[in-house]
Amino acid sequence: MRISTAYEGALGDYFAGNATDGPYNAHTDRPAMLELAGDVTGLRVLDAGCGAGHYITELRARGAAEVVGVEGSARLLDHARDRVGDDPAVTLHHHDLEEPLAFLPDDSFDLGVVALVHHHLEARRELLAELHRVLRPGGTLLLSTVHPTADWIWHGGSYFDEDRVETRFGDSGATNSYRRMTMQTFLGELLDTGFALERLVEPRATEAARRVDEARYLKTLRTPFFVAVRMRKDAG
C-alpha cells in the first residue's frame, strides 16, 4: 500500500485533529516515544512519516537542533507546514516511504523517529535499511507500531496471521488498512537490518487520555495497543 494514499482527503484531516488530543496518538504513543527519546538537545532528527508534524514541534521544543520530516500524504504535509510555521530548523519533504530515501545522505542523523507508520508499508525491510543507512554510527531509531496482541484481539483469526486488515477511526466512519505482524516478525526485521535492541515498551495511556475518552483510556489498561522500541546502530 502506497503511503501517499493512506491519509489523504477527509481521513488526513481527521487524523491531524485526532493526533492533537486523541487518546491513542497524543496520550499513548507519543508520550512513550518521547520518553524513549530522552534528551534530544542538539540532535539532528529524521521524522519518517511525520504526519501532521506533532513530533516535529515536540522535538524542537525539547531542544532538537534540526528536524527533517518526510511524509507521503500531501494533506498531512499541509497540516505539518501549518503546525511548524516558519521554523528555519525544520525541513519537510513530500515523499513516499515505499521508495528509497535517496535525497538523504549516509550517516547524517543522530535520531530517527518512525511513529505508527511502518505497519502501513509493504517495503518495511527496505525502509529499515534506509533508516540504518542515514543514521550516524551509534545513532538511535525509535519505532512504534500496532501491538500484535491487539491485532489478534481486534481482528481475530490466528495470532500468526500477517494479512492486511482494515480499521475504523473512532466514530468518523473513516477507514484505513495496514499489515499485521507477529512480535517475532517486528523485532526480527529490525535485528536483521543490523539494529540492536536497547529497550521495548508496551505503552499505557497517560491520565490525560481519561479526560478525552474514558472508555478508550480504560481499554489501554487492559490491552497493549502499541509497542515501541529504542534501537541502536552499531558505532562501528
Give short role names for the model-derived ranges:
Residues 125-137:
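A short glycine-rich, Lys/Arg-flanked "PGG" loop and its adjoining helix->strand segment in the class I
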Residues 1-40, 54, 58, 76-79, 140-168:
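Conserved class I S-adenosyl-L-methionine
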Residues 102-112:
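A short acidic, Gly/Pro-enriched loop at the edge of an enzyme's catalytic core
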Residues 46-48, 52-100:
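Class I SAM-dependent methyltransferase SAM/SAH-binding core
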Residues 193-195, 214-236:
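Core SAM-dependent methyltransferase catalytic element
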Residues 177-200:
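Short alpha-helix
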